[in-house]
């Protein structure tokens, strides 16, 4: 007897058969293997491989009209590490990777980007017209999940978080309607989609305001010895406070342990988004620290995004928190990381794993123009001081270590949260795109925004399709 999910796939095969991939087919295997994290490769009963908004609409109408519930997941790039957010076992996964085009209209200065595109291809297309949009700092990241979660970029200090550059959406709603959404036509839904993740529908096109690029930018990766950490941490906190004085500069700091070398080092991603020939003044304190090696040069955003790409083929977990910008928080994160390394050495069964504590500035300049652009639901306007996002990014090769690494990542974040609360440095905001499966980023947006999300969901999805049937990700009804 066929299972419910198999019956759902059979119905899809009738309504949109040329867009369905079943187990054992080449298309099915290619889709399953293309997730960033191996542990995210949950095998569905079938994949839907749409090429248009109409394909998505037919699929949604089919899935929501069956006598038994058809559970489904939605993926664009498959880069999320929150289990089940973009995949489902024994259900239906809608893989948007075939919807991957980018076009640019110079008359309106608008980039039209489909959700299955990767940021590398987006940049490659837009740079032909000497324009860009704020997007992923890693070439392989998909557009859809990135933009519906808000997202930071190389250009955040100049143009705001990436979602704020969205002028309009094409979205398939719960009843299958293909709707055009902007600040004038659907102001509440427009706002809710900026940070609302997969709670309202399936976005099939993003209309983004572009900006002119001055050609090459300057940046790359710098490697420092861990012995420089005190000077490095001081440089990072000073840089964060200085961002308003030079919004072209961006910094990501990574304290990283790799089991294959048994070494902890400091990796730094620097970018200066206008042409310069050497270290800009904004990075002077990093320049003063002796480095082991670096790749700093004049390059394109595409070049840096390719360089920043992490290898596929590993298992992965993320946890994240937000804190006041101060050196003590980063120092505590390094202490926690060192203790985590000791635990991993004692308990890990695999020999190939990496533990990263990643530090990034979050400053009011990133969100200060939100309301003028239709608003968002991130709730960051509550905060007027400079913040840090610290993410625990762990990868490993042996499935026997899954629970250990999940436990360690969560423990690291909880320990830093506890320390931050005790020192008055804790901030309730949780960056959705880095949040772990045990976290609640929607509640971190603030209760007012959470209630707003509930009202918008009730209006545009009264039957709760994207709460009940799309169970993965961070859901409003579970916040």
UniProtKB/Swiss-Prot annotation:
Pathway: Secondary metabolite biosynthesis. The modification Pros-8alpha-FAD histidine is found at residue 79. The keyword Ribosomal protein does not apply. Transmembrane segments: none annotated. Its cofactor is FAD. Residues 40-213 form the FAD-binding PCMH-type domain. One of its GO terms (molecular function) is oxidoreductase activity. SUPFAM superfamilies: FAD-binding/transporter-associated domain-like. Keywords: FAD, Flavoprotein, Oxidoreductase. It holds the Pfam family FAD_binding_4. Gene3D superfamilies: 3.30.465.10. Its EC number is 1.-.-.-. It comes from the Eukaryota. InterPro entries: FAD-bd_PCMH (IPR016166), FAD-bd_PCMH-like_sf (IPR036318), FAD-bd_PCMH_sub2 (IPR016169), FAD-linked_Oxidoreductase (IPR050416), Oxid_FAD_bind_N (IPR006094). Coiled coil: none annotated. PANTHER family: BINDING OXIDOREDUCTASE, PUTATIVE (AFU_ORTHOLOGUE AFUA_1G17690)-RELATED, FAD-BINDING PCMH-TYPE DOMAIN-CONTAINING PROTEIN-RELATED. Belongs to the oxygen-dependent FAD-linked oxidoreductase family. FAD-dependent monooxygenase; part of the gene cluster that mediates the biosynthesis of the polyenes aspernidgulenes. The carbon backbone of aspernidgulenes is synthesized by the HR-PKS sdgA, which accepts acetyl-CoA as the starter unit and performs malonyl-CoA extensions as well as regioselective methylation and reduction. The resulting nonaketide offloads the HR-PKS by intramolecular lactonization to yield the 5,6-dihydro-alpha-pyrone-containing hexaenoic acids preaspernidgulene A1 and A2. The FAD-dependent monooxygenase sdgC then installs the first epoxide on the penultimate double bond. This is FAD-dependent monooxygenase sdcF. It comes from Emericella nidulans (strain FGSC A4 / ATCC 38163 / CBS 112.46 / NRRL 194 / M139) (Aspergillus nidulans). The gene is sdcF.
